[in-house]
Structure formats: structure tokens, C-alpha cells
């Protein structure tokens, strides 16, 4: 605990002791398994708790960061000053007719499972995406020719005025790895997905097919944040990186995956600096060789 010990009492009035972690290792909360500690990590179990937590942070000028499953975040080795609000406990999933209503912390694989069990088609693409609903809506996550914009009906968000709003799909401005939620810094609380009735066996078969493909082609045995770079227009990041001769390129304990060049992985107990050094080298080398700019898809937080 570094800078915000004086604020613990503020959060203690709102949280049980078990929901508060001081000087929490962020490496235990993100998929990359790297990064320094955060001053305070809070795990709310209700939307009201989330709202009140952010009010406290804003009133006391405490920096705060919101995570779901930590699958698309890299925390630097110096850690995070302030508060991390982890939404994993807000994970209810409800099926009503051909709609699924899921809270922000629900895992995409669990939403996909619920859809399959309810014989609802359209969410199979997300069966292997390791993120949560909140993060998926935030960045319009996608895979295997599917994305959130294809299935979402609306998102319930906490806006920058601490008001809860329901934003219809038409106003979410969903594009490639972007949304109005990202642009305005809103926090996703729930999402409603509009699916179609289908044949359960066929839906499961598609899930199985995508799961097998992912296992065969991606380095799932190593910590990573999935695809490291956004897809540059007209290209594939992994192909550019491979063509640049960077498969297997390593710095310290991080490297470009031999299995899929689009993944930077923590292959030998690396540090956040190792991961970032690999990312920046890959970016610079692809620019040098092909004149193409690569931008990280992973979000980078914290201090060096």
C-alpha cells in the first residue's frame, strides 16, 4: 500500500474486508501474469457498489481503473497508483426468449455456453474469447468472422455523470475494436444480446470447431493478452510479423509466439518491461520493413 492508505476507511464503510485487497499483485489479476501492485483492489458485488465506489474516487481525486477478467490489459512493473475496480463478481446471465442479458463481469465463454444450452445461435464466435462482457462491449471484441456488434441489442452503462443509461445498438458507435463506451470512458454494467433460435447440436458443433481451431493455432499454454496488435487495414498483423522474420524473437522472458506471430507471450516468467520491449521492437521492425503502423490492441496501464 503506497499512496492511498488514508482512503481505506472510506472504502471500508462500503465493502466487506474480503472485498478489499491492499498492495494487490496485478500479476495475479491479468492474463499476462506480469506487472507491479495496485494500491487498492476492490471487488464490488453490486452495481450500486460500483456506482458508490466511483463517486468516492472522484470526490477524493483517487485515480481508478476498471477491469473485468484482465484478459486485454498489461500492467507495467511499477504498478498502479490508485484503485482497481474488478467486476468479476457481477456475472449474472439470464435467458429470456431469444435474448440473453448478461452482467459486465460474466465471461464470454459462459454467455456462449448459456446460449448453446438455450439453443440460441449467434454467439458461437465468442466461445474462446477470454474476456468478460464489459470489456467485450467496450472494445467490440470479435473472432472468427463474428463480433459483439452483430449480436448486441443494447448496453446499460454508468456514464461520466454517474448516471445509469441504456444505450441502444444504434448509438453505441461500434466499429473495429471501438465503441462510444470506449470513446467516452463509460463503464458497461450489463448488455442485452439478441440471438436467433437454432439447432442445439449444430450450435455445439460450431463451438467445438472453433475451440479446436483456437487450440491448434494459438499459444494458449502461455500467458498473453491474445492478439497483441490491432489488424492494420489491408493486412494481417501476424502475417506482417512473420514476414519480418520475428517469429520467436525474444527479449528477457517475453517473445513472439512460434505458433502464431500475432501473439506476444510471457514465455519464461518475463516482466512487463520484457513484454513491452518485444511489442515496441515488433512495431518498429514492421514499420521499417513494410511501412505499416501496428497499434497494440492490449491496454497498457501503470508506472515503469
Swiss-Prot record:
Enzyme Commission code(s) on record: 1.3.1.98
Predominant location: cytoplasm
Residues forming the catalytic site: 177, 227 (proton donor), 297
Enzyme class: oxidoreductase
GO cellular component assignments: cytosol
Catalysed reactions listed for this entry: UDP-N-acetyl-alpha-D-muramate + NADP(+) = UDP-N-acetyl-3-O-(1-carboxyvinyl)-alpha-D-glucosamine + NADPH + H(+)
Domain FAD-binding PCMH-type, residue spans: 33-198
Alphabetized PANTHER family for the sequence: UDP-N-ACETYLENOLPYRUVOYLGLUCOSAMINE REDUCTASE (PTHR21071:SF4)
Protein name per UniProt: UDP-N-acetylenolpyruvoylglucosamine reductase
Organism for this UniProt entry: Clostridium beijerinckii (strain ATCC 51743 / NCIMB 8052)
Gene: murB
Amino acid at each position: 500500500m503506497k499512496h492511498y492508505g488514508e482512503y481505506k476507511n472510506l472504502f471500508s464503510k462500503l465493502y466487506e474486508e474480503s472485498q478489499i485487497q491492499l498492495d494487490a499483485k496485478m500479476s495475479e489479476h491479468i492474463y499476462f501474469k506480469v506487472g507491479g501492485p495496485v494500491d487498492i483492489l476492490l471487488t464490488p458485488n453490486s452495481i450500486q457498489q460500483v456506482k458508490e465506489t466511483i463517486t468516492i474516487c472522484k470526490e477524493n481525486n483517487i485515480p481508478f481503473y476498471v477491469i473485468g477478467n484482465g484478459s486485454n490489459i498489461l500492467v507495467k512493473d511499477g504498478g498502479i497508483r490508485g484503485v482497481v475496480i474488478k467486476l468479476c463478481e457481477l456475472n449474472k446471465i439470464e435467458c429470456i426468449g431469444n435474448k440473453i442479458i448478461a452482467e459486465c463481469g460474466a465471461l464470454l465463454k459462459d454467455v456462449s455456453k448459456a446460449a448453446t444450452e438455450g439453443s440460441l445461435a449467434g454467439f458461437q464466435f465468442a466461445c474462446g474469447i477470454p474476456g468478460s462482457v464489459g470489456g467485450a462491449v467496450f472494445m467490440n471484441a470479435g473472432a472468427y468472422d463474428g463480433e459483439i456488434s452483430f449480436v448486441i441489442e443494447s448496453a446499460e452503462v454508468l456514464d461520466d455523470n454517474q448516471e445509469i443509461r441504456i444505450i441502444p445498438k444504434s448509438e453505441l458507435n461500434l466499429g473495429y475494436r471501438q465503441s462510444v463506451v470506449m470513446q467516452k470512458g463509460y463503464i458497461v454494467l450489463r448488455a442485452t444480446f439478441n440471438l436467433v433460435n437454432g439447432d442445439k447440436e449444430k450450435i455445439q458443433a460450431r463451438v467445438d470447431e472453433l475451440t479446436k481451431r483456437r487450440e491448434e493455432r494459438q499459444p494458449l499454454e502461455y500467458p498473453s493478452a491474445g492478439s497483441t496488435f490491432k489488424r492494420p487495414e489491408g493486412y494481417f498483423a501476424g502475417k506482417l510479423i512473420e514476414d519480418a522474420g520475428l517469429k520467436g524473437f525474444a527479449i528477457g522472458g517475453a517473445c513472439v509466439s512460434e505458433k502464431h506471430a500475432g501473439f506476444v507471450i510471457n514465455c519464461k516468467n518475463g516482466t512487463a518491461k520484457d513484454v513491452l520491449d518485444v511489442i515496441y521492437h515488433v512495431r518498429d521492425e514492421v514499420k521499417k520493413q513494410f511501412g505499416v503502423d501496428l497499434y497494440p490492441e492490449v491496454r497498457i496501464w501503470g508506472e515503469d
